[in-house]
Amino acid sequence: MYIPKHFESMELSRYKLSKKPPLGTLFSSKASRQGFFGWRTSSNKDDPDFGMCASHIPFVFVEFDNGEHKLIAHLARKNKHVEMLERVQKCLVVFQSVDSYISPAWFPMKKKTHKFVPTWDFAAVHVYGTPRIIRDDKDWLINMLSTLTDQEEEKRPEGENVRSKVERF
């Protein structure tokens, strides 16, 4: 992603954006057997060999004492994206905040200098990493779903503690 120098941000800002809201878009891609552009011509989009995949899912952001970070998320077992993630080495998660069109008419100096142009204002964070799939670990799944739910429920005054209820599912 191209970032103009005057819009580069600090680590703390990126951390805050990736935490609130926690919804991110998980992207993965692999080389197609048909060549670099083979994915464009494939008609079977359910095939995990299709080439590209994106899933919109909430994440839990974990920060360790040594300054390293980890994103944790849950995909349904039958989601074809899981198969692709098991076969790729890298993935990308994109978090976005609010965005808005910026009119040059909003700048008072525009009438004098005519040096303002329309633009689009937004905030986004790209997080690159290596996917790790965890299967058949009920304790991990319960803990992950509880942590994700607690992360959101604590924002509500009447937030619920769902940890005890999750085991029924």
UniProtKB/Swiss-Prot annotation:
SUPFAM superfamilies: FMN-binding split barrel. Transmembrane segments: none annotated. InterPro entries: Split_barrel_FMN-bd, TR_PAI2-type. Disulfide bonds: none annotated. It comes from the Eukaryota. It holds the Pfam family FMN_bind_2. GO terms for cellular component: mitochondrion. PANTHER family: PROTEASE SYNTHASE AND SPORULATION PROTEIN PAI 2 (PTHR35802:SF1). This is Uncharacterized protein YKL070W. The lineage of its organism: Eukaryota, Fungi, Dikarya, Ascomycota, Saccharomycotina.
